[in-house]
Regions:
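Catalytic and substrate-binding clefts that recognize carbohydrates or anionic sugar/phosphate headgroups
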Residues: 1-32
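Carbohydrate-binding surfaces of carbohydrate-active enzymes
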Residues: 28-40, 45-269
Length: 269
């Protein structure tokens, strides 16, 4: 495993240490009663590697225990289309997903559940099935381990409906009624409230019902103003005037949707 930006979060011992240095420290600060003071944690873009081949520390042990083989004997099948390569690649990415799912996502979810806080956030590259393989090998199983499952929606584009429909489908199957989007990043400083309203309504049309709006920074000094704007700070000329009505509209729309049940007429298998 080699990465410049992340540790091996598929390793349960690494995740245990992460929780000890973050969640447990916050809980200690609040006298062991963190759930009385904060609502939850937001996990942002966890992934097993990125646009390269993941090789978590535990994968060799998993292959020996569950498949009875030495993964090193077949590793070349990731790059060569020889006999058995399809089966091996399926197993390889399935194992990566299972290690990620249970050693990171489930651990965080269980800790939050035990301490009275909610886990929300989003993973990465939910926009298509192929992109998901690079980062998590399929996004839908991960939504089980978020109290408020979420997606990321970048730019001004009206993108594919795949991320919203996968999220809402998983939520319906799991009995979750809150579906979150982190949205409006990369829309730019010149984006208008009308454009943002259209972007949000498109997502709400497909079942999203809570927005985590990007971004309200502590400061706009230096390069901070270039952090994937738009920002809803005092540097935004219309934010103070428009946001109360804007947020009120989507608060009411979201509440209506969370109190409703979608009448689904078709299943896509």
């Amino acid at each position: 495993h080699t990465s410049l930006s992340t540790v091996d979060i598929l390793d349960d011992k690494v995740v245990d240490r992460f929780i000890a240095e973050t969640h447990e420290k916050y809980n200690e600060y609040f006298g062991g009663k963190i759930g009385e003071y904060i609502k939850g944690f937001f996990t942002d873009e966890p992934q097993y590697f990125g646009t390269a081949t993941p090789y978590p520390h535990l994968i060799e042990k998993y292959f020996r225990k569950n498949y009875g083989v030495n993964i090193l004997d077949q590793l070349g099948l990731l790059y060569c289309e020889k006999q058995g390569y399809r089966e091996f690649r399926y197993k390889y990415y399935y194992v990566c997903q299972q290690l990620f799912l249970h050693n990171y996502s489930e651990k965080l979810y269980n800790w939050c559940s035990e301490h009275g806080v909610k886990l929300t956030g989003h993973y990465i590259e939910e926009m298509g099935i192929t992109q998901q393989m690079y980062y998590c090998a399929g996004i839908m199983p991960f939504y089980e381990y978020e109290h408020i499952p979420g997606i990321d929606w970048l730019c001004r584009r009206f993108l594919t409906v795949i991320p919203a429909k996968q999220l809402v489908s998983a939520g319906a199957q799991l009995g979750k009624d809150e579906m979150l989007t982190e949205t409006f990043a990369l829309t730019g400083w010149d984006v208008t409230p009308t454009e943002l309203k259209a972007i949000a309504e498109f997502q709400f049309l497909y079942g999203i019902n809570i927005m985590c709006m990007h971004l309200l920074p502590y400061s706009e000094l230096g390069h901070r103003k270039n952090d994937y704007p738009v920002h809803f700070s005092s540097s935004n000329a219309w934010a103070d005037d428009v946001l109360p009505k804007f947020n009120g509209y989507f608060d009411r729309l979201g509440a209506l949707m969370r109190g409703s049940e979608e009448d689904v007429k078709a299943a896509v298998l």
